[in-house]
């Protein structure tokens, strides 16, 4: 519990005494869009693969099955 308290106090201390940058961060929207599209494509391909994983197995014929008498 004391470690959590120390962590919270350190976070508050750093937030209060940190200076704002003169030049704020500027996003590179083109790279962000391309990265998002790649991530989405990989995620969708993984989901489709996971859903179809057991669907494409070949059917086996059980001619020697003794339980079908």
From Swiss-Prot:
InterPro entries: Ion-transport_regulator_FXYD. Its main location: membrane. Residues 55-69 are cytoplasmic. Keywords: Cell membrane, Ion transport, Membrane, Signal, Transmembrane, Transmembrane helix, Transport. It is a single-pass type I membrane protein. Residues 23-33 are extracellular. May modulate the activity of a sodium/potassium-transporting ATPase. Disruption phenotype: Morpholino knockdown of the protein results in an increased number of sodium/potassium-transporting ATPase-expressing cells in larval skin. It is found in: Cell membrane. GO terms for molecular function: sodium channel regulator activity. The chain crosses the membrane at residues 34-54. Detected in adult gill and in larval skin at 2 days post-fertilization (at protein level). In adult gill, strong expression is found in the basal regions of the secondary lamellae. Induction: Induced in larvae and adult gills by low salinity and repressed by high salinity. GO terms for biological process: monoatomic ion transport; positive regulation of sodium ion export across plasma membrane. Residues 1-22 form the signal peptide. Belongs to the FXYD family. It comes from the Eukaryota. Gene3D superfamilies: Single helix bin. The gene is fxyd11. This is FXYD domain-containing ion transport regulator 11. GO terms for cellular component: membrane; plasma membrane.
